[in-house]
């Protein structure tokens, strides 16, 4: 609930035209073994972003960047994501740039290839 609470409280302090960028991962769309709870949370955040974007005022935007397994973490996490194609960190960074500097709201910015 940390990211949700950040938006719930932060919207009262964010300047008009500001934005929130939340973070999730590939598990919302492509869960793997033993990830039921994380997959559920990722999917819930996706739905929260879509709904909250309809209710935020003063031009405040909200998006979520959802990343696949990042190349930098392959050594540590590859066993948990069999058959997944690692994503270059630059691609993930560009997702955040798109969210912060773009004009979209309510977007799930998926930064992963077809697993």
Positions of PLM-derived features:
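C-terminal helical subdomain
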Residues: 57-60, 64, 70-115
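Catalytic loop of short-chain dehydrogenase/reductase
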Residues: 1-6, 11-57, 66-69
């Amino acid at each position: 609930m940390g990211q949700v609470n950040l938006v719930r409280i932060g919207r009262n302090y964010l300047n008009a035209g500001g934005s929130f960028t939340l973070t999730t991962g590939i598990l919302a769309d492509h869960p793997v073994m033993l990830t039921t709870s994380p997959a559920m949370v990722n999917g819930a955040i996706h739905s929260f972003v879509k709904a909250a974007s309809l209710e935020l005022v003063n031009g405040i935007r909200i998006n979520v960047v959802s990343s696949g397994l990042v190349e930098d973490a392959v050594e540590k996490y590859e066993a948990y994501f069999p058959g997944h194609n690692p994503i270059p960190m630059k691609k993930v960074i560009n997702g955040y740039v798109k969210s912060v500097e773009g004009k979209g709201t309510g977007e799930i910015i998926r930064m992963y290839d077809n697993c």
